[in-house]
């Protein structure tokens, strides 16, 4: 009989987005409890050691974070297994580096460097809108934030632009056709496109049809769609590839063309 929370995570059971090698040991770092789900986060130890190569071992990561050098969304984090997740801004003041955790078209967390201007805000998806005690309206975002007295026009599935320093809502983007979105789950993870239509299925999952800038169309569940811009203008900078996934044939043609150009 299980007693209490699990404390370990086997390497083979770790999310594929972490890109851990199969033979690098038995275990993977189990993320602490926090604002993002275990399968949708990237622990700081993997970000600093495996991605940025700032440390060789977990012990070195511990020494880095205990010096209070790493900030996530403007707050110092000293837990090496702190779960940073989609849209979080990771800042390292000692090296003047700013990153936003975002998916590439292969569905992996990519190292996406951003400008100091862009690091002042983040986008949050609205998960719930409700009324609390004394009829105070509030909303809950995808990263576990509760914001009181939001604009009454903000509804579930919309995105808000949040000022990280003040945690105030700067702007919001409605979930509607023609707006730019990124896919945060499923087989189309990391793709970017504009919403074409939404199929309602009461009692089941609503399906959203999306078209990317090359004209490819695909469909996904509503809860995998994260609005990132009005019209075709994105509120955040996108990683290399701009969220456009090429087919295998298109990737091959691109490689051949690059090889010919290099000769």
Swiss-Prot record:
Keyword rRNA-binding: yes
A Gene Ontology cellular-component term: cytosolic small ribosomal subunit
InterPro entries: KOW, Rib_uL2_dom2, Ribosomal_eS4, Ribosomal_eS4_C, Ribosomal_eS4_central_region, Ribosomal_eS4_central_sf, Ribosomal_eS4_KOW, Ribosomal_eS4_N
Residue span, S4 RNA-binding domain: 42-104
Domain of life of the organism encoding this protein: Eukaryota
Record-level Gene Ontology MF annotations: rRNA binding; structural constituent of ribosome
Protein family: Belongs to the eukaryotic ribosomal protein eS4 family.
The protein, known as: Small ribosomal subunit protein eS4
Organism of provenance: Bombyx mori (Silk moth)
Gene: RpS4
């Amino acid at each position: 009989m299980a007693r209490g929370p699990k404390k370990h995570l086997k390497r083979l059971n770790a999310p594929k987005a972490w890109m851990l090698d199969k033979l690098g040991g038995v275990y993977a770092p189990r993320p602490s409890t926090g604002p993002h789900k275990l399968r949708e986060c990237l622990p700081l130890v993997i970000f600093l050691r495996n991605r940025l190569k700032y440390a060789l071992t977990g012990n070195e990561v511990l020494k880095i974070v205990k010096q209070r050098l790493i900030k996530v969304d403007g707050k110092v984090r000293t837990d090496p297994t702190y779960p940073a997740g989609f849209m979080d801004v990771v800042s390292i003041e000692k090296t003047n580096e700013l990153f936003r955790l975002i998916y590439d078209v292969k569905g992996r967390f990519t190292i996406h460097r951003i400008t100091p201007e862009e690091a002042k805000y983040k986008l949050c998806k609205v998960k719930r809108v409700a009324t609390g005690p004394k009829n105070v309206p509030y909303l809950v975002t995808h990263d576990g934030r509760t914001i009181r007295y939001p604009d009454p026009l903000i509804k579930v599935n919309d995105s808000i632009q949040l000022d990280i320093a003040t945690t105030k809502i700067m702007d919001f983007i409605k979930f509607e056709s023609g707006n730019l979105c990124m896919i945060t789950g499923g087989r189309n993870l990391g793709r970017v496109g504009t919403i074409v239509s939404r199929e309602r299925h009461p009692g089941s999952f609503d399906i959203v049809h999306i078209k990317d800038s090359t004209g490819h169309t695909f469909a996904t569940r509503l809860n995998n769609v994260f609005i990132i811009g009005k019209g075709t203008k994105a509120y955040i900078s996108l990683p290399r590839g701009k969220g456009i996934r090429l087919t295998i044939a298109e990737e091959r043609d691109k490689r051949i063309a690059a090889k010919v150009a290099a000769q």
